[in-house]
Each structure stands twice: as structure tokens, then as C-alpha cells.
């Protein structure tokens, strides 16, 4: 089905999004995403979109810089970072491993400021398109203030990464 749709379409990509794992949905684990890609064929236009809320809800602990790094290493081993094409950034109303897809505004959920800062400052995400997919006030979507918060959290995450590298270099 996916291969057929891509065969009939020129000039666009299709990104399969990871899921929170509710019910019988596919795409909760990186192994499931890899199997979906394999089943769909080798079209270079087929990639993966990682959603931060879905990662946490499906059991991937991305609440810290180190945790996100380990999760991305797992993704690379199972799927390949070359297949990662886009991102959805949001916080999660539900805890790690809940398998429930409930988006929250940035910094107001289980990821918190630290998890959102880790996601926003991840070097392997640097050139990927990212959709701010948050409910916002009265479920009207992201606000200018939330975009400004994302910019601050990105800088905070980058500073934390620099401090971590400096500590590592000092120990060496």
C-alpha cells in the first residue's frame, strides 16, 4: 500500500510517525518501525518522524540529555539515523511507558523543561524539520510565547551539553 502510493507520487516524502503504543497500533518500538520500513520497500522518500510525547509514552526515557542520546543510539541500531526525517515536539501529559497519546504544552508535562531542552538541543536533530505540536491555550495550538520558550530551552540544553563535554574532557 505504501509502496504503491509512493510509486504514484512524485516530489514528496512520506514520514511514518512513531506511536505511543495504545491498543494494537504499530510503530511503538524502533523494531516495529524498522519492520514497517522493510515491508514498504526501499524507496528513499520513505522515512521516520519521531514524536517526543510518543517516545516517552511508549517507554523511551528522553527526559535527559544522556537518556535521549541512548534512545537515539537504539534508533540508529534498529532503523538508522539516515531514515530519521522529521520531528514532532511536544510534552506529555502521561508518564513514561503509559502508552497514552496525550500532548502537553512545552515544559508542562512529564518531559518538563529538561527533557524539552534535551530534545531541542540534540545535535543529530540540527537539520531536521520540527513541528511544534502542542495543544496551546483553549486547544488553539502553539503560541509566540511557547516558541520563545523553545528558543530559551534550546540554549539551556546547548549550555548543558557544553558543560557535560567540559567535565568529560577534564576527566580524560
Q: Each predicted region: which residue ranges?
A:
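Active-site acidic/histidine proton-transfer and metal-coordination neighborhood
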Residues: 1-47
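A structural motif corresponding to the C-terminal end of an alpha-helix
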Residues: 4-14, 40-45, 78-82, 118-128, ...
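Short Lys/Arg-rich cationic patches that frequently serve as NLS/NoLS or arginine-rich RNA/DNA-binding motifs
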Residues: 155-172
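Conserved, mostly hydrophobic/aromatic
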Residues: 14, 51, 87, 130
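Alpha-helical membrane segments in multi-pass integral membrane proteins
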Residues: 47-54
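Short strand-turn motif at the edge of the Rossmann-like AdoMet-binding core
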Residues: 19, 53, 134-135
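Gly/Pro-rich active-site loop or hairpin
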Residues: 26-34, 56-127, 135, 141-144
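C-terminal helical cap(s) of enzyme catalytic domains, especially alpha/beta-barrels
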Residues: 140-160
Amino acid at each position: 500500500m505504501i509502496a504503491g502510493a509512493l510509486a504514484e507520487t512524485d516530489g514528496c516524502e512520506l514520514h511514518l510517525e512513531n506511536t505511543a503504543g495504545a491498543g494494537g497500533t504499530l510503530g511503538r518500538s524502533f523494531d516495529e518501525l524498522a519492520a514497517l520500513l522493510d515491508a514498504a520497500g526501499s524507496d528513499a522518500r520513505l522515512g521516520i518522524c519521531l514524536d517526543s510525547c510518543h517516545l516517552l509514552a511508549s517507554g523511551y526515557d528522553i527526559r535527559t540529555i544522556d537518556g535521549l542520546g541512548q534512545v537515539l543510539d537504539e534508533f540508529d541500531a534498529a532503523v538508522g539515523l539516515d531514515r530519521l526525517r522529521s520531528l514532532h515536539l511536544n510534552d506529555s501529559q502521561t508518564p513514561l511507558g503509559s502508552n497514552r497519546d496525550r500532548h502537553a504544552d512545552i515544559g508542562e508535562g512529564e518531559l518538563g523543561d529538561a527533557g524539552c531542552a534535551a530534545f531541542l538541543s540534540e545535535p543529530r536533530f540540527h537539520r531536521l524539520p520540527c513541528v511544534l505540536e502542542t495543544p496551546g491555550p483553549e486547544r488553539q495550538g502553539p503560541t509566540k510565547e511557547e516558541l520563545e520558550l523553545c528558543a530559551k530551552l534550546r540554549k539551556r540544553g546547548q549550555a548543558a551539553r557544553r558543560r557535560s563535554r567540559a567535565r568529560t574532557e577534564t576527566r580524560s
